[in-house]
Amino acid sequence: MKKILWTLGALLLLGVISIFVIEQWLAKNLEDRVNSNEERAYDLTFEEVNVQLFRRSIELKQISLSPRKTDLPSTIRGTMTSTRLGGVNILGILFGDVLEIQELKFEEPKFVFTKIDSVARKPTDISDAFQGLFGDIISRGVIHNVVLNNGSGEFFTKSDSLTKFGSFDNFNISAVDLETDSVRLNYAIPFKLKSISSSLKNLHLQLDEELSFSLGGFSFDSDADAFDLRDLKLAYEDSNLEAAIRSDVQKDFIEIDVKHLKIEQISARSSIYGNWSVVAGLITIDSLNLHDLRNKNKPRPVDEPEKPMFEGMVELIPFPLEVDTIRVLNSQITYAQISEGKTKPGSLNFENLSAEITHVVSLDSLQSGEMLIHGEAILNGFAPMRMDVTVPYTREEGKENFQLKASVDPFGLPSLNNILGDLVSVNITSGSMEKLEITMDANEYASSNFMKFDYQELKLELKDEQEEKKKFMSTLSNILISNNNLPENRNYKTATFQTERNIYRGTFNLIWESLREGMLEIAPGDLMQLIMGEQDPSDGGKRR
């Protein structure tokens, strides 16, 4: 009996010693094992290893990630409080060449992304770099699940010194059932997997000296096939008004604020990481506020390109996009300009905007059929309006066209004074608009239009004239125009006309010019068209 107890005691002691030796061996050799691949892009080092053999668990503390090549256009370095390897195949480490782990968990990693200052900043550069980092680490073994908790990062440019241009925090990833021998570049973890969820908060990027982009948060869940972005902002350091005043040239200064953007019914053909491509059933944009400002006191750029129309704008999207429906809710779009000789902008405000755009395809090789746009808004708070646009996909460069039908509900005509502003030489003192409808058949050079503009009791008053001359000319103007234009009137007028497109201005400028020309065609006589008309500058309309 005593001999048996001695034997059991010896075996137990031998087992304890063996476990201790194995744990010490693993602690000593693990760093060499995880850095054994000569083709690895990063070195993974750590100061402390805690091996728990019975739990099949290894915990690494004070981890550092550093690139093996430091002369690349962009690099990532990282530190972590701890990393846990759970469900480790101990026998595989001891007697095999493969490191098999059930779960790899990163706690509070901090990343530093650095790029050479001479290289242009592209958001895809950052996501590509992180995808490469995760792929490099996870490919060092057979890892079934990956968890990253509470990560953060900073972005720097490098010239003579480091300059910070961005940051993020609360970065989380959970990837389940990875197949590390099967590459798939759709997600942050670049392997085939059963499911992945990820989230991030407080992303900020300084795009240039004046313009910045921020994102309050995003989340992605592959099981729900949904991608959420909240509080997106594209803004100038002070405002787009101040930026337009400082600028040496005339151009569009655009600020964007979006409360919520959601992409749903995401196809497996999509890639939401690295080189973006989005194939989805529905994109919902809630509470978009877009403000576009132009300062006409500044000269246009000498080499200014021609502006595209609807099809061309879709093709300018910098990544492949194929979406069944884009839905816009609770939004506002403002087009503002500072007229020549003025210091304050006037604006067109499309409030309470809702829209639905179907069959949106950015790659011309995939385009077929037509894109349909339906929109409703209230113009400057007084004129409810609707618009339907059909955009055929021509797939031919320089052959854009669209057909538009729009209508505006009744409103008081004096409300137009705030919109017409400095574009005309008169004020509207009274009158009501009963119906305004326009159809347009537009190509890249001109639009053929038909318009109904029904109004009654229209009266005008000239601006900025001596009192006697002002009274006389205002009386003459009201004699020459038709005070009423209703279907029951004998001289009821509609307008069939053409509007030449200014190729250096956008599509909405063509729509506005067509509306303006149609109103002038119907309401005033020849004298008023001369008074109200705006002549093209000698440069073919570039300054308009």
Q: Predicted segments — roles?
A:
Residues 118-127, 243-245, 293-311, 344-349:
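Short, flexible helix-coil linker/hinge segments at the edges of structured domains or between repeats
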Residues 45-118, 131-160, 164-167, 174-232, ...:
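Flexible beta-edge/linker motif
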Residues 164-167, 180-225, 229-245, 299-302, ...:
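Interface amphipathic segments
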Residues 1-39:
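N-terminal type II signal-anchor transmembrane helix
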Residues 109-111, 237, 456-458:
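Structural signature of outer-membrane beta-barrel domains
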Residues 40-47, 431-433:
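A short, amphipathic edge element
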Residues 2-8, 390-394, 407, 418-544:
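Extended terminal
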Residues 99-101, 198, 215, 256, ...:
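Glycine-rich, small/hydroxylated-residue low-complexity segments
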